[in-house]
Design a protein with these regions (language model features):
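Activation segment signature within eukaryotic-like protein kinase domains
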Residues: 175-176
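Conserved small/polar residues in nucleotide/adenosyl-binding loops
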Residues: 289-296
Length: 301
């Protein structure tokens, strides 16, 4: 909890203020913590950009750490995504700066630029219903940060697991339609997502359900002339052109991945790798998947 001058402190989970004599937030039940859960995390209460108070960690992976944070200017809760590739950098407990080895610096700097490019890509679509809002991005502590709206809900892959592997046709179509709208907007700006899959689709809960297409970190301009091409692969969802360096990617790359995601939602079975399907492919009819679908829905799979 962050101390205030008027004998009040702020909870690092719900960010409401309460008396500093208490060790448990009376609003959300969050227990006061004075240091990070993991040595590599920023300590709760850390100030970023002289504006954002870091709170609890809401997600962490090999490429970054996402914190819940308090925007002191707008007085609202946001999400702050920290660029942190765990195999390239580390952080000493209690310190803010990331530590980059000399051998890793070139790769880290390159990927940091890609991270900031993700922020710029997302910022172009601030008013889009199906793309997360980005408020700001900046560099600090030897790394970079993206400030975006805090989403409440779960990733599609987690939802599928919760639902036993597959969902009903109507909801699957809603999800695919919203993702399709997001992709249409990206493609209109000549941006290819390259990583459409259940773990990058987020189902927001609240007064109304919203679908968000996440992680534009792999996104690339369709006509890019970069000498370095990252090969982004997600078996079952990546089309053949993503398995080589031919640069032959385009809107069709994302459409294939969306189709594979729709197949997974409807059947509970991840499609075979596209490279295998080029050799031998037998499309499983809807009737074989025990779906209760209309005849007009059979084209979906």
């Amino acid at each position: 909890m962050r101390r205030r001058s008027n004998n009040m402190k702020r909870c690092f989970s719900c960010f409401k203020e309460f008396n500093e004599s208490l060790s448990v937030c009376p609003y959300c039940g969050h227990v006061e913590i004075t240091k990070a859960e993991e040595p590599i995390y920023l300590a709760p209460g850390t100030m970023l950009a002289n504006r954002y108070i870091v709170g609890e960690v809401v997600g962490a992976g090999g490429f970054g750490i996402v914190y819940k944070a308090w925007d002191t200017k707008l007085e609202t809760i946001v999400a702050v995504k920290e660029f942190f590739i765990s195999r390239l950098v580390t952080r000493a407990e209690g310190l803010k700066n990331v530590i980059i080895s000399k051998n890793s610096k070139d790769e880290f700097d390159y990927r940091k630029e890609r991270f900031l490019a993700e922020a710029k890509n997302m910022a172009k679509f601030g008013s889009h219903r199906s793309i997360p809002n980005v408020f700001e991005f900046f560099e600090e502590n030897n790394t970079a940060y993206i400030v975006m709206e805090l989403l409440r809900g779960m990733a599609l892959n987690d939802y599928l697991n919760q639902m036993g592997g597959k969902i009903d046709v109507d909801f699957a179509i809603v999800i695919a339609t919203e993702v399709g709208k997001a992709l249409s907007s990206l493609h209109a700006e000549n941006i290819i997502h390259r990583d459409v899959a259940p773990d990058n689709i987020f189902i927001c809960t609240g007064k109304e359900i919203k679908i968000k297409l996440m992680d534009l970190g792999a996104a690339k301009l369709a006509d890019s002339t970069d000498d370095v091409i990252d090969i982004i692969l997600k078996p079952g969802y990546s089309p053949p052109e993503q398995y080589d360096n031919t640069k032959n990617i385009g809107p069709w790359t994302d459409i294939y991945a969306l189709g594979a995601t729709l197949y997974m939602m409807l059947t509970g079975v991840k499609p075979d790798e596209s490279t295998n399907r080029k050799i031998s492919d037998e499309l499983v009819p809807v009737s074989y998947t025990h779906l209760r679908a209309h005849e007009t829905d059979s084209y979906l799979v």
